[in-house]
Amino acid sequence: MAAPSEPAGFPRGSRFSFLPGGAHSEMTDDLVTDARGRGARHRKDNAPAAAPAPKGLEHGKRPCRACVDFKSWMRTQQKRDIKFREDCPQDREELGRNTWAFLHTLAAYYPDMPTPEQQQDMAQFIHIFSKFYPCEECAEDIRKRIDRSQPDTSTRVSFSQWLCRLHNEVNRKLGKPDFDCSRVDERWRDGWKDGSCD
């Protein structure tokens, strides 16, 4: 959401090609934007009226960068000879990868035998985290999964395995392969047994 001192965002009725889930709108051909989707405006004033914007892309709001992957958005744009900056806000895929890396590393360094207070704090952290995750569609999905399978914070191993199973559920939903949960410590704490991380 734009700060009060920032421009209002996009003109009324504008639609974007970087919709949640990578959906494509037929209404995007008349928009002019920069390489990151900023400054959308119509090429011509007589463009047809757009359907209501999906949740998160309403009038006056900047598009949710964390809600869509950059590649999906770029496929809908004209070919450009622009080198993209590396210090731009993360897209949905980058945010997801970095979030899972953080969570798995957090679980890998969780105490082997946590105190009751640590167990409660970690379970609470996971619940709060799922409420504030920037991609609302993703956050809602994680909350539903957590409701079905509460975080097991009783030990480091239990928590790491619970998180790996949760991640594999999401991977299956996205058509990605499962990770072998017996190897979480190799991946996130100790390094691969072949010594390639030493």
Curated annotation (Swiss-Prot):
PROSITE patterns: ERV_ALR
Entry binding sites for FAD: 92-100, 104, 133, 164-176, 187-188
Domain ERV/ALR sulfhydryl oxidase: start-end pairs: 88-188
Cofactor(s) annotated in UniProt: FAD
One of the GO biological process terms: positive regulation of DNA biosynthetic process
Location, primary (coarse class): mitochondrion
Keywords assigned: Disulfide bond, FAD, Flavoprotein, Growth factor, Mitochondrion, Oxidoreductase
SUPFAM superfamilies noted in UniProt: FAD-dependent thiol oxidase (SSF69000)
One function term, GO molecular function aspect: growth factor activity
Keyword Cytoplasm: no
UniProt region (Disordered), positions on chain: 1-59
Compartments, as annotated in UniProt: Mitochondrion intermembrane space; Mitochondrion
Short name of any one Pfam family annotated for the protein: Evr1_Alr
Cystine pairings recorded for this chain: 135-138, 164-181
Origin superkingdom: Eukaryota
Keyword Hydrolase: no
E.C. code: 1.8.3.2
Subunit field text: Homodimer; disulfide-linked. Interacts with CHCHD4/MIA40.
General function of this protein: FAD-dependent sulfhydryl oxidase that regenerates the redox-active disulfide bonds in CHCHD4/MIA40, a chaperone essential for disulfide bond formation and protein folding in the mitochondrial intermembrane space. The reduced form of CHCHD4/MIA40 forms a transient intermolecular disulfide bridge with GFER/ERV1, resulting in regeneration of the essential disulfide bonds in CHCHD4/MIA40, while GFER/ERV1 becomes re-oxidized by donating electrons to cytochrome c or molecular oxygen. May have a function in liver regeneration and spermatogenesis.
Official protein name in the record: FAD-linked sulfhydryl oxidase ALR
Taxonomy of the source species: Eukaryota, Metazoa, Chordata, Craniata, Vertebrata
